[in-house]
């Protein structure tokens, strides 16, 4: 049913309690409540914002990021690898979670990324072939025009799932020439099907945009929750924050998750679960809740004044995040980008009218062009050799690794090293962005990343660069025993020098694309990095990167499979407790992670149903 009052919620005899009604949590809620005899409860700290134009419209993210009504608005500790800056760490605070505030990019990783979870890290049962049916089950691909430069195959896409995917209706005029310039500079063929597990090359990307009528965001609320909110066995409590998991001891001394304690409207309540508690609070708050409940590194717990119930030094460690930098050029006269709307009120009015009349124009969706290249193809053999030597011998990360499982970290490093020497590996992502990409202001406030061109410049276009397989590792840990206190978030940005090498190589390549003769007459001059910075000097390129990155908002790994949870996503050393969200992903992937999180949650729902004896419904959904 729709969201309920707290008294109704706490008096319900739930079978499953899902902590967090975000990207993964609402998938689980919808799938588990398919069993009519099962009571499912969802606890969400934010509000239901169904029909909110800030959420629905493609231009909405800039209005939501940093707004506490939509965003947890976390901040990292100062980052030593990025000139001691403290970074804005946005996380969706609403039903739908970050699927409701992100930029709607729908990517799938390379098949190798997922296969490495099993083959390199020993997480059995999680391979590309086993996860692909769940990518398809979550997706509703809308018809793609043949001219869209995004080849799709029905074999790898779903057309009846909850989440709509489509090509945005607007493309910046420069992008056809830019796509050709990418092809020329990279000397790569365009991918035959970029969602099949092989996405090297450049193409127009899908987005979670529902274009069946007015183009609106398709996210966990609209796709998974809204169609089933009338179910009597599904209850959602909004504006309630879980404080800790309630644990009891079985006769063998192993703790059992009995329910949770929550805070709502100034009061605390306990609510129980007869079968399982499932954490879907995300990569920041799932490990925080484990630690608040006494599950984690004993030294961390002791420092926060929390009694240790289950010792696991991996809880909250292994944090991995993509970082982004960018090259921006000023467009030539007559070449429009989204920046043009900031400079010309009449043009803005024209595009507002286009959106109102037929849902077209620059306000209907602005980012479409992207691609992936290997690191080895952008660097000399000498540079690649030097990078390889630094992977396993980097003093700047030795302190971080000492508190984590050394063997586990070594296997991750070996996997990255193998990819970076592979000429078919999608090591670096490039995103065509029809606006000035302001890393100088965006690190402290993500809402300012695309807020118009700098003074003295007309409309700009940017190529955003991201390292897909970072070696830097960070952590999320409680500071105190108070659940209302934000945890200490240390992403470890650029703490490994190889990450700087990779981003610098990407910046140099992006600049080369802009200088292609195919863009003559379309771009005028470089805005960032400044014209005086010599990108032929890799030391200068590295220095630029260290001062000009922002997070991509793809944090994962803090409750990793194999370390904190097992292959069925059960928390080690505890009964009736699972984690299902991005935190269980053991290693970073070459994609925005939303599609993978949907797939993981879909698969988790089948695992849980099978474990609980509900197997009769499984085959109907694959």
Curated annotation (Swiss-Prot):
Task: Please list the residues that bind FAD.
Answer: 23-24, 44-45, 102-105, 582, 593-594
Disruption phenotype annotation: Leads to complete absence of citrinin production.
Q: Does the keyword Flavoprotein apply?
A: yes
* A molecular function GO annotation: flavin adenine dinucleotide binding
Which pathway is recorded for this entry? Mycotoxin biosynthesis
* InterPro entries in the record: FAD/NAD-bd_sf (IPR036188), GMC_OxRdtase (IPR012132), GMC_OxRdtase_N (IPR000172), GMC_OxRtase_C (IPR007867)
Q: Name one GO biological process term.
A: secondary metabolite biosynthetic process
Q: How does it assemble?
A: Homodimer.
The protein's job, in short, is: Non-reducing polyketide synthase; part of the gene cluster that mediates the biosynthesis of the mycotoxin citrinin, a hepato-nephrotoxic compound to humans due to inhibition of respiration complex III. The pathway begins with the synthesis of a keto-aldehyde intermediate by the citrinin PKS (pksCT also named citS) from successive condensations of 4 malonyl-CoA units, presumably with a simple acetyl-CoA starter unit. Release of the keto-aldehyde intermediate is consistent with the presence of the C-terminal reductive release domain.
This protein's name: Dehydrogenase citC
Species, as recorded = Monascus ruber (Mold)
Gene name, Swiss-Prot/TrEMBL: citC
